Amino acid sequence: MKEYGTYYVPTISAGEFVSTKAKDVGYYPELIRKKAELIGPKIKKSFKKALEGNVKIAFGTDSGVSLHGENAKEFVYMVEQGMKPLDAIKSATINSAKLLGVETDLGSLEIGKIADIVAVKGNPLDDISLLQKTFFVMKNGRIYKNITG
């Protein structure tokens, strides 16, 4: 992947969801349950391998199995597996913009770029889980969420 500049989009949260549900008796048929238990650890292992190999990593949001609106858990999973908090944030911003070929308009806070901003109380570099508790959301310069106080 590194040799070809290919991005890895792990979506660890999908594996976590499937592996966790595999522990709920009856959630999956027995034939599937055994295989489902292994998904989370396999994704984590491949993530660590990509991280250690300096493969470009972008943020996955389309797990299809976990609850919608819980995408920020992915930051926690990435950091738990050894990624630096700033690199986890970059995976969701500039790295994803580069993967999609839209980095001239998105992915970083710069004059002339589209204003997509979230804010949290505290420093996510100290506690990445803060990104699960946004109090301010701006997309394309329009405020969608602004909880003050």
What residues fall within each predicted segment?
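Short aromatic-centered micro-motifs
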Residues: 137
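Active-site gating loops and adjacent loop-to-helix segments of metal-dependent hydrolytic enzymes
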Residues: 4-40
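Small/polar (Gly/Ser/Thr/Ala-rich) solvent-exposed segments
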Residues: 126
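Short, small/polar residue-rich loop motifs at catalytic or cofactor-binding pockets
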Residues: 130-132
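His/Asp/Glu-enriched, well-ordered alpha-helical/loop segment
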Residues: 28-31, 38-123
